[in-house]
Regions:
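Flexible, glycine-rich linker and terminal segments associated
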Residues: 22, 88-90, 96-127
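Sec-dependent N-terminal signal peptides
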Residues: 4-15
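N-proximal, solvent-exposed amphipathic alpha-helical segments enriched in charged/polar residues
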Residues: 20-43, 55-57, 116-117
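Transmembrane beta-barrel domains of bacterial outer-membrane proteins
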Residues: 45-91, 123-197
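Generic detector of short, well-ordered, non-transmembrane alpha-helical segments enriched
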Residues: 16, 44-45
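Sterically constrained small-residue positions within well-ordered secondary structures
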Residues: 11, 39, 135-137
Length: 197
C-alpha cells in the first residue's frame, strides 16, 4: 500500500512539474504586459502566442520577451508566435540546447538571437495552439497613442516647397481578429505656409 501511495505521489509531482513550465511562460509574458497570451506544451516544445503592444516597436518587445523567457530554468524548446491584431505574423523557434547553453553562460544573448529560427510560416504553431484559451485579451481595450508627423515636400530640387511638424494623437482599439479601429486627429505645430495654420 505504501508503495502505491509513493508511486502515485511521484506521478502527481511529475505531472505538476510538467504543467509548471507553461504557467511560468504565461506568467512571465503577463508580467511583461503582453496581450493575447496563449501557451501550450506539446512534445517537449512550449508554444506561446502573444502581442507586444506595450513596447515601442514590435521588435523591441520581442527582444524583451526572449530575454526573459530564456532565463526560465529547465525550459524546453520555445516556439513563439508573434501576433498583430490577433493575426499570426512571425514564428520564432529557440531550441532547448541553445537555451541551456545561454543559461550555463556558454553563449551570449546575441548568439541566441543569431541562432534562433525565424519564419513567417506560422501554420504549425497555430495548429498547436488551436483550442487554447487566450489570456489578457486586447479585444475592446482602448489605447491612446501620439504619433509625430514630419512632412517635407520638394517639387523642385532647389527649393523646399512645404515643411510641417504635426502631432497626431489617436485612440486605437482592436475590434475582432484582423480588424482595428483608429480615430486620429492632426494637430499642426509648425509650418512654413503662411495663413494655413
Amino acid at each position: 500500500m505504501k508503495r502505491i501511495v509513493s508511486v502515485t505521489a511521484v506521478f502527481l509531482c511529475g505531472i505538476s512539474l510538467l504543467q509548471a513550465q507553461p504557467v511560468r511562460v504565461s506568467e512571465t509574458l503577463k508580467e511583461l504586459d503582453m496581450e493575447n497570451i496563449s501557451v501550450v506544451e506539446k512534445r517537449d516544445t512550449i508554444t506561446a502566442a502573444f502581442k507586444t503592444s506595450a513596447y515601442r516597436g514590435i521588435y523591441n518587445g520581442i527582444g524583451i520577451a526572449i530575454r526573459h523567457l530564456v532565463a526560465i530554468p529547465e525550459i524546453p524548446t520555445l516556439q513563439l508566435l508573434i501576433l498583430d491584431n490577433a493575426l499570426p505574423q512571425l514564428c520564432i523557434t529557440i531550441p532547448a540546447e541553445l537555451v541551456q547553453k545561454y543559461q550555463a553562460g556558454e553563449c551570449e544573448l546575441d548568439e541566441v538571437y543569431r541562432k534562433m529560427g525565424m519564419t513567417t510560416s506560422t501554420e504549425t504553431a497555430v495548429r498547436q495552439l488551436k483550442g487554447v484559451k487566450r489570456k489578457e485579451s486586447s479585444f475592446g481595450k482602448v489605447d491612446l497613442v501620439v504619433y509625430p508627423n514630419v512632412m517635407l515636400v520638394n517639387n523642385v530640387t532647389y527649393k523646399l516647397y512645404k515643411a510641417a511638424l504635426e502631432l497626431q494623437p489617436a485612440v486605437e482599439m482592436q475590434l475582432w481578429k484582423g480588424a482595428s479601429l483608429r480615430m486620429q486627429v492632426s494637430l499642426p505645430i509648425v509650418s512654413n505656409e503662411d495663413g494655413k495654420w
